[in-house]
Regions:
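Alpha/beta-hydrolase-fold serine-hydrolase catalytic core, especially in secreted/extracellular enzymes
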Residues: 1-81, 234, 255, 261-263, ...
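Short, solvent-exposed loop/turn and secondary-structure capping segments
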Residues: 84, 95, 108-113, 139, ...
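Alpha/beta-hydrolase
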Residues: 99-102, 137-139, 221, 457-458, ...
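Conserved alpha/beta-hydrolase
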Residues: 124-144, 545-562
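Short glycine-enriched nucleophile-adjacent loop
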Residues: 175, 202-212, 597-600, 619-630
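A conserved short beta-strand
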Residues: 214-224, 229, 630-643
Length: 708
């Protein structure tokens, strides 16, 4: 089902890409909006201040035909960009200039990084020997100061999504500032600037050419394909985060490429490139060609396909050289010189000692500003304005990947049985096409008129032997000790993840839960079965003392829809969601909303007060579900993370608000009880409640046991 889901979502994005552009007038009306969206998705909105570059040449290397200046500049204070500037000798007038963006070519020896500019020196040398100035940049990750591109790829930094951060934005910004630097050089003709690079550098060539019209011609090499290749064919697994935007507006890559039009653009690739497959490259080219045709500039768009794999070869280099000769020089001579390397890595090194004030290694923590901590609103009107702004921004920036229209639920009862005085039911429903989920209900057999529903949203964090990570027994019936809580009595222990829930429930209902056991495997041992039976008996006994319907839902990727358990595969599944302008967490919020909607379609359940319950990430997902789904009476939130820095990732959420502000909004709509959570950091919700005169029971906090 997951494969089909990704196919369907990718197809929707592909179909919408540039679909509204029918005429040149359409394009002109949309172009600047698109460009501003791209700035935003590259973490560049608002655009950083253009501070003093503090450019410095640290040395020179001489060749008989050109000079190489070893230089650095600061694109932001402390964000150093190391580069080599190739200058032809005996220039008579300002020359056409190429910004060359380096790909992933590490040059590291004896613990010293010389920068990936060294790996691409032959390109700079060719351009300089043929009358061009060429500035070759190091990248953030593989420069002389080593930064990071692999936040979600291998470092588990999912908060990058919540920040709206991508290292592609740093590379784009460094390129913009590189053009600023080139404009300060008397040798450079600023009206004849071109951009190229291959692999990662090909991607950065796309960013700078799309964002900055100072680039008059571009020739990205092996740096683009479409979402179908990335998401459906799995190409994403071979790429780090510098290749991707934060896809807030759900673009396909042709939309980036179209922003270069009508300027000269050459798309270059090979026919056997496994990380930029040819079919996706050509689909991208076909969509971009339409935009060039609208401009009557079809001859400004070219495509070159060379033979072979993902490799820097003459078959790709020569067409690029010719492209710039034609469009920056107005000539097309025979290419007689090959691109060759002349220097050792040590020759091109900029820094003998790295600067102490560099922020390169941690720029991901500061590049995108987060939302400022809000003040408590002075009155109801101010609060409503703030609340409505937050909700609108969340829907637009964080949850745009939700379906725009409600698909059919297709609710069907799977089973309904009674054992040991407990009625246990299950209903299948569709959260989205290709996302089937199952809703479970349990209550005492004799219950006729329930007074509440407690819907527990299970997470994927497995424990062993039905024990919590704190050693407490897992339990299925919970609630605070308040009289109006959804379950009577003090909370006992920690409610389980799906596998623990299954172990408990199948002690009484093994036949009904056969599919679930097959889905997750790993049956329990005798000792665990005995313990699970004891947990079920406590659950059964609790149901006899109240009128609560206990309900359970496992969102996508958990329970029946469990995916490949391999940790690396789980990472790449999450990154696929990310590329589609979603996150796994944000779509689990949607699943929770759909579970509530499904409940309302079950006979007799429409008007029963419904509470949501969850812990850790599921607790935050429930919190946001309550902001967008009407009719939720209350929230029981356990071990609630205080920030999306450590909690679930939703695109851009930290640019809008953080968890405490979401708690305040939820508390206006329903009762919110935060349990087993550090008491510090929740003062905003309490202050809003007090200032606006809400009922004292709207927001309650029970700190961690033993906390002072």
């Amino acid at each position: 089902m997951l494969v089909e889901y990704f196919k369907n979502e990718t197809a929707k994005v592909a179909q919408s890409c540039l679909a509204e552009i029918k005429t040149l007038e359409d394009w002109k009306n949309h172009r600047e909006k698109y460009r501003q969206q791209l700035f935003e998705m590259l973490s560049l909105s608002p655009l950083p201040e253009k501070t003093d570059l503090k450019a410095m040449v640290t040395g020179k290397v001489e060749h008989e035909a050109f000079t190489v200046e070893k230089l650095h500049f600061q694109s932001l204070p402390g964000l150093y960009v190391t580069a080599n500037l190739y200058l032809p000798k005996e220039l008579q007038k300002p020359a056409p200039t190429i910004l060359y963006l380096s790909g992933h070519g590490p040059v590291i020896s004896n613990g010293i990084s010389y920068g990936n500019k060294v790996a691409y020196q032959h390109h700079g040398a060719w351009f300089a020997r043929n009358g061009y100035i060429c500035l070759i940049l190091d990248t953030l990750q593989l420069g002389e100061i080593l930064g990071l591109h692999h936040g979600t790829h291998r470092e588990g930094m999912w908060w990058w999504n919540s920040r709206g951060y991508t290292p592609a934005g740093v590379e784009a910004w460094n390129s913009i500032r590189a053009l600023d630097y080139l404009e300060t050089r008397a040798e450079v003709d600023p009206k004849r600037l071109g951009a190229t690079g291959r692999s990662g550098g090909g991607a950065y060539s796309w960013w700078i050419a799309a964002l900055d019209e100072r680039i008059k011609a571009a020739a990205p090499v092996a740096g683009i394909t479409d979402l179908h290749n990335h998401v459906v064919d799995g190409v994403v697994e071979g790429h780090c985060d510098c290749m991707f935007t934060v896809n807030t507006y759900r673009w396909d890559y042709a939309q980036v490429a179209a922003l270069v039009a009508p300027r000269p653009l050459l798309i270059v690739n090979t026919d056997n490139d496994t990380i930029f497959p040819l079919d996706g490259v050509m689909r991208t080219h076909d969509k971009v060609r339409h935009i060039y045709q609208l401009h009557r500039a079809a001859t400004n768009l070219g495509v070159v396909i060379g033979p072979g794999p993902h490799k820097d070869t003459q078959d790709l280099q020569v067409p690029v050289f010719r492209w710039f000769n034609r469009h920056l020089k107005g000539e097309d001579p025979i290419i007689e010189t090959a691109a060759v390397k002349f220097f050792q890595p040590e020759d091109l090194r900029v820094f003998n000692t790295l600067p102490d004030d560099s922020v390169n290694t941690n720029i991901h923590a500061t590049f995108v500003p987060t939302a400022k901590r809000p003040s408590v609103p002075p009155d109801q009107q101010a609060w409503q304005q703030q609340r409505d702004t937050w909700l609108s921004l969340l829907r637009e920036k964080s949850f745009a990947g939700w379906p725009s229209e409600l698909p059919p639920l297709d609710l069907k009862q799977k089973f309904s049985v009674v054992r040991n005085g407990v009625r246990f039911q299950a209903y299948d429903f569709s959260s989205q096409p290709n996302v089937p989920l199952r809703l479970y209900l349990a209550h005492r057999e004799s219950l006729k008129k329930p007074d509440r529903i407690l819907l527990s949203v299970m997470d994927a964090t497995g424990q062993s032997s039905s024990r919590s990570r704190t050693g407490k027994d897992a339990t299925l019936a919970q609630g605070s000790s308040k009289e109006n809580s959804p379950a009577s009595g003090d909370r006992q222990g920690s409610f389980p993840a799906f596998e623990e829930w299954l172990a408990i429930m199948e002690t009484a209902f093994p036949k009904e839960l056969t599919e679930e056991r097959m889905a997750i495997g790993a049956s329990t041992n005798q000792s665990e079965r005995v313990h699970s039976a004891q947990c079920f008996e406590r659950f059964r006994a609790s149901l006899q003392t109240n009128k609560t319907i206990m309900a359970f839902i496992a969102p996508r990727g958990i329970g029946l829809t469990t995916w490949n358990p391999d940790a690396r595969k789980q990472v790449q599944i999450r990154r696929r969601f990310m590329l589609l302008g979603q996150t796994l967490a944000s779509m689990r919020v949607w699943d929770t909303r759909r579970a509530v909607q499904a409940f309302r379609e079950i006979k007799g359940m429409k008007d029963v007060p419904l509470w949501l319950q969850g812990q850790r990430e599921a607790a935050i997902n429930n919190l946001y579900a309550a902001l967008f789904e009407p009719g939720i009476a209350g929230l029981e939130l356990y071990q609630l993370p205080k920030s999306h820095e450590t909690g679930p990732d939703y695109l851009n959420v930290l640019r809008v608000l953080d968890v405490p502000q979401a708690v305040a909004m939820a508390a206006e709509r329903c009762s919110v009880r935060i349990q087993d959570t550090d008491e510090h950091g929740w003062d905003f919700a309490a202050a809003v409640e007090t200032k606006l005169g809400w009922k004292e029971s709207q927001f309650e906090l029970s700190p961690l046991a033993g906390a002072k």
